[in-house]
Regions:
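Bacterial Sec-dependent N-terminal signal peptides
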Residues: 1-6, 13-58
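A general structural signal for short secondary-structure junctions and capping/turn motifs
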Residues: 2-3, 56-57, 111, 263-264, ...
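Residue-level marker of positions within ordered structural domains that often coincide
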Residues: 29, 97, 320
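Generic recognition of flexible, low-complexity loop/linker segments
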Residues: 52-53, 81, 302-303
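C-terminal transmembrane-bundle signature of multipass membrane proteins
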Residues: 53, 63-66, 340-347
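Chitinase-like catalytic core of GlcNAc-active glycosidases
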Residues: 61-78, 83-89, 93-261, 267-281, ...
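Substrate-binding cleft of secreted/luminal carbohydrate-active enzymes
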Residues: 269-347
Length: 347
């Protein structure tokens, strides 16, 4: 049955790829993604493909996350539509999770129901701290506040921001959240610094732990440096542990980061490295590259291999949108990465 389903997916995927080449647009008017031609010309075959796709995703395979820039609320091209992402993605992480419009909500619903793609969003500790610092600086730079003290404590601010963001799950029916916290090593900290760091850890990851316990049906992925977290029990609750490796320059860098992360208390069977897609800026030859090769493809090859001390169960891709626009067909790098990790079984 597994072989049969995979061959159905492969065969129809070839047809869909052909139709996707025809539907690549270069106009700059607001557009709506066209339903692939095969869904109209042979709806029965397309329905079999979608059924096989969902069955495939419900089984064991390498997971793929894609970070998606949804800042364009009135898309000027198909590549800015949620519904245009590769069918074989498992999780789509929206970069702007608030104020979703009807089109976005409709597309989120469609890719989940038809293709089994779940939509998440990220809560990033560093960005919350940057927002707090910006608010504090703006307050202090305002001449009307001369002689006044900025009384908003960061810990209070952190709790409020994280809790408000988590409410987006129910507001917009997200399937879960990626919570990113770069815990710092406490080896060289003073006792005062250790206490302050543990307090922030306990707030951010404590909220994550409590939220997951109250929402067992939602997905929790944790990203950062798990080896530096004191209370590692939260990693038993999450489905995935994402290791950010955007700065990597080789497969060896990925292996090094994972080896550092997989310490006692960190499950070794939930590991997913996060790397960058190449930049849309053609002069940027570093982002998303290992020398002249693409980091996404190199990491996919690494994920496809067997490892003694841990399991790489998938791949996470930052700036996934950048891979859309190509002459031959859309999202070629992501499609190739998925094929590397989940090859068609030939019989």
């Amino acid at each position: 049955m597994k072989y049969y389903i995979q061959h159905i997916i492969f065969g129809i995927s070839v047809l869909l790829m052909a139709f996707s080449m025809e539907s690549c647009d270069t106009d700059h008017e607001p557009v709506k993604v066209k339903t692939p031609g095969i869904s109209n010309q042979n709806p029965e075959l397309y329905a079999r493909y979608l059924s096989g796709l969902r069955t495939y995703k419900s089984g064991k395979h390498k997971i793929v996350f894609g970070w998606f820039d949804n800042s364009e609320k009135i898309p000027a091209s198909q590549g800015q539509n949620i519904i245009a992402v590769p069918d074989s993605l498992d999780y789509l992480v929206l970069t702007l999770p608030e104020n979703l419009n009807d089109r976005e909500l409709s597309e989120m619903k469609e890719i989940k129901e038809k293709k089994g793609i779940h939509t998440l969003f990220e809560i990033n500790f560093i960005r919350i701290k940057e927002d707090y610092d910006a608010e504090k600086e703006a307050f202090e730079d305002n001449s009307d506040n001369a002689g006044k003290i900025f009384n908003l404590d960061f810990r209070t601010y952190l709790v409020d921001k994280v809790q408000k963001r988590l409410k987006l799950c129910s507001t917009f029916n997200y399937d879960g959240v990626v919570m990113t916290f770069y815990a710092k090593t406490k080896l060289y900290m003073t006792e005062k610094e250790k206490t302050a760091q543990r307090t922030l850890e306990n707030i951010f990851l404590g909220i994550a732990k409590d939220w997951k316990q109250r929402h067992p049906d939602k997905v929790l992925a944790l990203a950062g440096k798990p080896q530096n977290v004191d209370d590692k029990s939260v990693f038993d609750l999450c489905e995935y542990i994402i290791i950010p490796c955007q700065a990597s320059t080789s497969a060896s860098d990925i292996v090094y980061s994972i080896n550092k992360a997989v310490v006692e208390g960190v499950p070794n069977n939930k590991i997913i490295p996060l790397v960058s897609m190449y930049s849309k800026d053609k002069t940027d030859t570093k982002t998303g590259y290992w020398g002249k090769s693409l980091s996404v493809l190199g990491t996919a090859k690494l994920a496809a291999q067997q490892h003694t001390d841990y399991q790489i169960i998938g791949l996470a891709i930052d700036n996934a949108n950048n891979d859309y626009y190509h002459v031959r067909f859309v999202y070629p790098t992501i499609r190739e990465a998925i094929s590397i990790m989940n090859p068609i079984v030939k019989i």
